[in-house]
């Protein structure tokens, strides 16, 4: 599990330049990525905290991730949840998606709350996270109402056309 969390943190923290005009990797995140790869979580946490103090939504999210995992700091689900909410409030798409999933399942000490889950997933979907549309569609289909089914299909059909495997599976 820790390897998955570590890989996810590195993936989230990295901004890969795939084109000549793509933005350069933020040097602060490059340093943090190096620290994480070296498993120096205490220093990575300190560097993220400095960056988070400037209001950087990704840094706040990553602090939540480390706090949830107990890497570089004491494991604390309540604090992690608060950090994820702060990041989402600043418009970080991944935080909105994670919170949506959290409120579906009831993780991080919260009780499952479909209304709150839908709120976060809708924000994540509007911010371009396709998986949020799939999760929303699954929630709507679970309501077993004609209007909800229509909403679900409206979300799924564009993804099916793009070949999204989760959408194809859910649509079947």
Identify what each model region corresponds to:
Residues 2-54, 58-62:
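N-terminal leader/linker segments that initiate helical-solenoid repeat arrays
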Residues 23-24, 40, 53-56, 69-71, ...:
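Short helix-capping/linker turns of helical repeat alpha-solenoids
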Residues 126-128, 138, 142-147, 154, ...:
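Solenoidal tandem-repeat scaffolds enriched in leucines and small polar residues
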Residues 50-51, 86-87, 123-124, 158-159:
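Canonical positions in the second alpha-helix
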Residues 62-69, 98-106, 135-142, 172:
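Hydrophobic face of amphipathic alpha-helices that form TPR/SEL1-like repeat modules
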Residues 39-46, 74-83, 110-120, 144-155:
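Structural signature of tandem alpha-helical TPR/SEL1-like repeats
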Residues 25, 170-172:
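Terminal, low-structured helical/coil segments at or just beyond the last alpha-helical repeat
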